[in-house]
Amino acid sequence: MVALLAEHTDTNQQAGLLVRPDNHDSLSVAVTATPVVTTTGTPATPPGLELEIQNGDGVGKRAGLPPRRKIETWVKSALYADAALTIRFVDEEEGRTLNRTYRGKDYATNVLTFAYAENEEDPVTGDIVLCCPVVETEAREQRKPLEAHYAHLIVHGVLHAQGYEHEEDAEAEEMEAIETETLQALGYADPYQGDRTV
């Protein structure tokens, strides 16, 4: 485990460090500075978000879909940089087609993230696709509220859009810790308690 601490010499600035894997054998480290709360009590500016929400052809007005305001809250809670994201809810057929086409796996999965930034200087852009029937089945089987499962998978997708991965054990531990902390701050239970389906 490595602990990093960032302090800014200007007390009106908050320093930040972002460490993320670039490839299998390298890491990127970014140092940032953001204004601290001003004397008027105004917080530092949160990351900007352009959010589009789409429903695939087979979804329509499906019961249980989260409202836009909740989706936006979940996305912002996991966002560390300005972003332009699309959240798309799809049926099993579209989910399976996307998973087969882009991952070579012939089944529908709960969430797919398509991140388009080629390097860390690029703005965070991506599409997060949630397959409604799979999400609903998982929530039922895991005895989780459907809303909590959607929140978890959207947070998970937003982290992927920002470069987080879970191929290696250390990456998975880091990502799961961020997801758990984020969801608990939103008032949801630990998403990994009892099950590791993501």
Curated annotation (Swiss-Prot):
Its cofactor is Zn(2+). The keyword 4Fe-4S does not apply. The keyword NADP does not apply. It is an enzyme of class 3 (hydrolase). SUPFAM superfamilies: Metalloproteases ('zincins'), catalytic domain. Its main location: cytoplasm. It comes from the Bacteria. InterPro entries: MetalPrtase_cat_dom_sf_prd, YbeY, YbeY_CS. Its EC number is 3.1.-.-. One of its GO terms (biological process) is rRNA processing. Binds 1 zinc ion. PROSITE patterns: UPF0054 (PS01306). Belongs to the endoribonuclease YbeY family. This is Endoribonuclease YbeY. It comes from Cupriavidus necator (strain ATCC 17699 / DSM 428 / KCTC 22496 / NCIMB 10442 / H16 / Stanier 337) (Ralstonia eutropha). The gene is ybeY.
